[in-house]
Amino acid sequence: MISGLLVHRKRCPLVLCAAIVVGWSSAHAQTAPESPAQHLSPLEESTARAVDTHLADNLRLLEQIININSGTMHLPGVIAVKDVLAPRFQSLGFSVRWVPMQSQTQRAGDLIAEHPCPDGGGKCGNRILLIGHMDTVFEPQSPFQKFSIVPGTDGKVATGPGISDMKGGLIVMLAALGAMREAGALEHAEIRIVLSGDEERTGQPLELARKDMIDAARNSDVALEFEPGSRIGGNDTVSIGRRSSTTWHLETTGLSGHSSQIFGPRLGYGAIYEMVRILDAFRRELPQDGLTFSPGLVLGGSSAEMNAEATGGTAMGKANVIAANALAGGDIRTVSNQQTEQTESKMRLIVAAHLPQTDAKISFDEGYPAMAATTAGRELMQQWSDVSVALGLGPVAEAGIMTRGAGDIAFVAPYVSGLVGVGLLGEGAHAEGEKGYLDSLAPQAKRNAILMERLTLPLKLRRK
């Protein structure tokens, strides 16, 4: 239902257009664009003003939820963030429910909010799905725990755990919906929200962990993922694709004995040479566009054992003893699910070509699928860019799929078109010192709100 929704709007006076983007750099100023979609209607102007009106309150809310530790495995913290957000969605007219997941996936759960179309399901233009997550990679034992303004940035940049990935996106989402509500546009929209509590360390099995999100997508037309946006070369960008992420585990075995007999017919090559053969064959034979594969951990010796989290382990051996065991773990990232299948097949063939007197086996964990770029996705991105131009923020470019990792939107991509990275802009995600650009909160909220209005409201209401 995306195509054909770019409609004529009244030209906004340049003075008013400038007022909408208070504090935004003059470097983003636009000359008069030619597309009618690149102008704001009076309703859209009201929406943009509402974002600015409540900006200070939303910045305070951002600080509040950042200062709640919600590392994925700190379930009480994830639930505490949910307890802050849920009443705010309710105040906007959403019905809210919490789906606990502790017993099914050993994770906190999903927050689901729904705003029905008053005329009945599917009768308010495009049905929109907003997705995000409440957890971060920073567990309670991390020294990185609190929000703070970065000195020398005039209050425009802050640091804090999950500020860009993606607590900032949660506030962008609330700010956009709040502005739509204040302008009178939200009442005509059909919107579903699914916020997971385990995006950074997904619970298993995946069919349960992402069931709520997939079910919502089956009843939606467009998805917006509020993960962090990015600036490339000083320009704001958005993505329409994500790469997959699959973890692999490799084990090799060999016959142990005195090192003087290695390569001989009785003892053969040992487990470590078999491991090296396989990893080097991966390096030589697997490369193709869009594919990365990396061994992140290798253990080997007379004995080797990896811990349950696959983050370390123990290995024992001697310089003059042929290794009997070796273990490795790594990941694969692809631009399509077909590429994932082809890569796994090639890896299995490589593993099966053993050196003498060795054996090897490889397994793959259930992982994140890829989200391929589509024509419908590019049409949606163009509408996002048109909104940005209408706001005086300049066009938005596409950030290529190689700039993004895996994400939840890939689970819903078979059912909807979507945009990736419509949340708070920032840098350094997953690392201590992660930054968020506070001056991007209002622009991102305006882009989201007005795009949602254009996707859901009939023309006669948008022109009011």
Predicted regions and their residues:
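Metal-dependent amide/peptide-bond hydrolase catalytic core
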Residues: 30-42, 70, 231, 240, ...
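Alpha-helical metal-binding/catalytic segments enriched in His/Glu/Asp
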Residues: 130, 153-204, 246-252, 261-285, ...
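Acidic/histidine-rich catalytic neighborhood of metal-dependent amide-processing enzymes
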Residues: 157, 166-241, 303-310, 462-463
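Acidic/His- and Gly-rich active-site-bordering loop/insert found
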Residues: 31, 35-161, 181-187
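Extracytoplasmic/secreted envelope proteins and their assembly/folding machinery
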Residues: 59-65, 82, 86, 174-177, ...
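Short, flexible, mixed-charge acidic loops at enzyme active sites
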Residues: 140-152, 241-244, 308-313
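Bacterial N-terminal signal peptides that target proteins for export
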Residues: 1-15
